[in-house]
């Protein structure tokens, strides 16, 4: 593959479900680019906890062989070495962070200050303490390096881009609310179904969700509400609401207090049936009102407040009519006031998340090409 001035060098950090899928999608993108004679991505470094491979002289790595190549060098490539490597790139560079690492997220200013662009689904950078967040944003603004994280909320759904476009076009954001967790979407859609009486116990549905791969290995990591809190923090900050951290506002936890100290997931799941009656009474109260129960995040931009809560919704409400593990986000604005703008779809999964990251990479590449284009 020949490298033109408008190609972009890419370093991939994290090769798990999302990272591995992204490498496959980049390979397909490059094959189409080669056929069409358009710009492609030169993947020049791949790093994970298992191993790494860094290309000599920035030559594109053969993406059909990346697993074999990274197995030659144990452990992750040093972040400082990666900053230095990308800073010396003869072509514009993108760091793609597919991890959930706080350490990598806190290193973003090092990359950005060297004019290394970043595309990532990592929520930690944008929901960390306000000081960490502001340092990242400041580094991007001062260097001009692009920073995109569409997939940090809603996987491949156009949530962040929609919010930014509403703001850029002069709309006034009043409220953002939604069902941000695919796991909790599934649990509540089954436990509190629309149009019929819920019969399954909360504990049984959590167990089924875990068996089907919807939850984290320890379901408490979903039920504590912090994943939703991080996503609401990200959107709140973009909308101009000061949020000190994802733990600085009210977050409803679905973990019964006595089970917070359970030593492992098995002990937690064994004890959860003891609290089914408490959850059932909540559901029965909603059903008497002709409503369903949903777990939602809310950024009340007009009043500068943020929270994560359980809420009851009428059967006709969009939040009451989701399928499976779908996400749904509603934007109430000055323009979209009577009927809020709604984004709905699959908000989890390696394929859609990787596609969201690739979409950001394509946007970065397009902007880099535009800045490199000769003036008329």
UniProtKB/Swiss-Prot annotation:
Per UniProt, the cofactor note for this protein states:
A sodium ion is seen in the structure; a metal ion may subtly affect the relative position of the nucleotide-binding region to influence enzyme activity, and could increase the stability of the enzyme.
Q: Which PROSITE patterns match?
A: HOMOSER_DHGENASE (PS01042)
**What reaction gets catalysed by this protein?**
L-homoserine + NADP(+) = L-aspartate 4-semialdehyde + NADPH + H(+); L-homoserine + NAD(+) = L-aspartate 4-semialdehyde + NADH + H(+)
User: Where Phosphoserine occurs along the chain?
Assistant: 201
What this protein needs as a cofactor is: a metal cation
Name the residues that bind L-homoserine. 216, 227
InterPro entries annotated for this entry?
Asp/hSer_DH_NAD-bd, Bifunc_Aspkin/hSer_DH, HDH_cat, HDH_CS, HDH_short, NAD(P)-bd_dom_sf
Q: Which GO terms describe its molecular function?
A: homoserine dehydrogenase activity; metal ion binding; NAD+ binding; NADP binding
Q: What does this protein do?
A: Catalyzes the conversion of L-aspartate-beta-semialdehyde (L-Asa) to L-homoserine (L-Hse), the third step in the biosynthesis of amino acids that derive from aspartate (the aspartate family of amino acids), including methioinine and threonine, the latter of which is a precursor to isoleucine; production of homoserine leads to a branch-point in the pathway as it can either be O-phosphorylated for processing to threonine, or O-acylated for processing to methionine.
Q: What is this protein called?
A: Homoserine dehydrogenase
Query: Top EC class per UniProt?
Result: oxidoreductase
Question: EC number(s) for this protein?
Answer: 1.1.1.3
* Pathway annotation from the record: Amino-acid biosynthesis; L-methionine biosynthesis via de novo pathway; L-homoserine from L-aspartate: step 3/3; Amino-acid biosynthesis; L-threonine biosynthesis; L-threonine from L-aspartate: step 3/5
Q: Does the keyword Metal-binding apply?
A: yes
- Recall the taxonomic lineage recorded for the source organism: Eukaryota, Fungi, Dikarya, Ascomycota, Taphrinomycotina
Protein residues bound to NADPH: 18, 67, 99, 123, 349
Q: Where does NAD(+) bind?
A: 18, 99, 349
Origin, by domain of life?
Eukaryota
Report the sequence similarity comment from the record.
Belongs to the homoserine dehydrogenase family.
Per the Swiss-Prot or TrEMBL record, the active site comprises 231
List GO BP terms, alphabetically: aspartate family amino acid biosynthetic process; homoserine biosynthetic process; methionine biosynthetic process; threonine biosynthetic process
- Read off the Gene3D superfamilies from this record: Dihydrodipicolinate Reductase, domain 2, NAD(P)-binding Rossmann-like Domain
Going by the UniProt record, its keywords in alphabetical order are: Amino-acid biosynthesis, Metal-binding, Methionine biosynthesis, NAD, NADP, Oxidoreductase, Phosphoprotein, Sodium, Threonine biosynthesis
UniProt: Na(+) binding residues? 150, 153, 155, 157
Q: Which residues are NADP(+)-binding?
A: 17-18, 99, 123, 213, 216, 349
